[in-house]
Swiss-Prot record:
Broad class of the protein's primary localization: cytoplasm
Pathway(s): Cofactor biosynthesis; coenzyme A biosynthesis; CoA from (R)-pantothenate: step 5/5
One of the Pfam families matching this protein, by short name: CoaE
Organism: Streptococcus agalactiae serotype III (strain NEM316)
GO molecular function, one term: dephospho-CoA kinase activity
Name the UniProt record assigns to this protein: Dephospho-CoA kinase
């Protein structure tokens, strides 16, 4: 029987680094963010849905989604956030389910990286849930450095996500990413060996 492990965390918690280590260890990982980017590409299902909802002002000069502008429009307004979630979640869920079902045919163990795994109620999809955990202050610092956000912008982004401390109770494994890369890699390799 196939074992499916959900990988989650928060913005700037280090999920991408963890995913890279898992892939380098020979495991397949479905990355929800990559799925979303494909769906938002010109002509994709999310592209069409967002264009119908918000109009052509969300496009750049090449007709692609202007992601910073789209993000600003959605995060600036709580009603837009709700509408965006409702609009996008069913399309994303369908595509993730399709990819999950395909991997079930070929893999004994695989991972699905979903940032909002708990919030969007994907829990029942998984045999285990691994949480990439980082302290809030470190998360803020990483987000400000990575995205060139002010502290206020970073705090606003974090305020729209479930705190990582609240996600701990859902996790089968907590990957502590407050240390260095070597320590992180050791934790992951140890967990993978126990599968």
């Amino acid at each position: 029987m196939t074992k499916i492990i959900g990988l989650t965390g928060g913005i700037a918690s280090g999920k991408s680094t963890v995913t890279k280590i898992i892939r380098e260890s020979g495991f397949k990982v479905i990355d929800a963010d990559q799925v979303v980017h494909k769906l938002q590409a010109k002509g994709g299902k999310l592209y069409q849905a967002l264009l119908e909802w918000l109009g052509p002002e969300i496009l750049d000069a090449d007709g692609e989604l202007d992601r910073p502008k789209l993000s600003q429009m959605i995060f600036a307004n709580p009603d837009n956030m709700k509408t965006s979630a409702r609009l996008q979640n069913s399309i994303i869920r369908q595509e993730l389910a399709c990819q999950r079902d395909q991997l079930k045919q070929t893999e004994e163990i695989f991972f699905v990286d979903i940032p909002l795994l708990i919030e969007e109620k994907y829990i029942k999809w998984f045999d285990e849930i691994w949480l990439v955990f980082v302290d809030k202050e470190k998360q803020l610092q990483r987000l400000m450095a990575r995205n060139n956000y002010s502290r206020e912008e970073a705090e606003l982004r974090l305020s729209h996500q479930m705190p990582l401390t609240d996600k701990k109770s859902f996790a089968s494994l907590i990957i502590n990413n407050n240390g260095d890369l070597i320590t992180l890699k050791e934790q992951i390799l140890d967990a993978l060996q126990r599968l």
